[in-house]
């Protein structure tokens, strides 16, 4: 029994001349049908390849968007804190900083803050500080406003890193990026109780809708202001994030102890800029570098 006709296998077209006019017409019709079938198949394969590429690009954009929203919500939560409750320090670049220990290549760390997290933070930020050429990136101690001792940016978090209430009580609580990138972060955040937080030391003072409303007003064009913690590069169409916020994001990652923070900081320095307030890093470059280390 002959095999069915198809792209692979089956009978090959006959090379013998047709015996009559009817046979010639039938053979021409079969050849035309076979040609149209192959052309249609090639067209569908090209469309499938294009759809695959498009889906991959959409998947990458979704990951970038999830990471951006995660950082943005964390950033806005901190912005809503009263100034006397901010235990996460912010950096400022000063042309002539006061006489003190500075982060200009050699940092004097107080033994009070000598912990594994601080050492990791120092290793990471030591590579980034060179972008502020001719300036010293300094951070005053939050313990005492008159204490002018300095330590790496955001290395000391007196509130045990994360408050006991979640500001990710929506779809963002199931972020899965870079191969279950944040899968274990869900256990870090407790479910939001839905009741008003009355404790004076709690960070979260507004609900998710208020945070989203504030987010719309925070995007600015090229430039930076001390009250705004990230900016948009008007030329490259990229988002620039504070190095402090990137560190706050990385230090709670379950694999933080497996990262080579010195190499990570060195690679991120390639896209870092100094805004006279903080060190800013390209979001796209951070995603590319960070995902390659997982």
UniProtKB/Swiss-Prot annotation:
Effect of residue 145 to A: Impairs largely arsenic-induced phosphorylation, shows strong sensitivity to arsenic treatment and a strong, although not complete, reduction in arsenite-induced expression of ARR2 and ARR3
Impact noted for substituting residue 141 to A: Impairs largely arsenic-induced phosphorylation, shows strong sensitivity to arsenic treatment and a strong, although not complete, reduction in arsenite-induced expression of ARR2 and ARR3
Keywords: Activator, Arsenical resistance, Cytoplasm, DNA-binding, Nucleus, Transcription, Transcription regulation
This protein's record includes keyword DNA-binding: yes
GO cellular component, one term: RNA polymerase II transcription regulator complex
GO molecular function, one term: DNA binding
Disruption phenotype: Leads to hypersensitivity to arsenic. Impairs the arsenic-dependent induction of arsenate reductase ARR2, arsenite transporter ARR3 and vacuolar transporter YCF1.
Domain bZIP: 22-72
Positions bound to arsenite: 132, 137, 274
Localization per Swiss-Prot or TrEMBL: Cytoplasm; Nucleus
Stated name of the protein: Arsenical-resistance protein ARR1
Record lineage: Eukaryota, Fungi, Dikarya, Ascomycota, Saccharomycotina
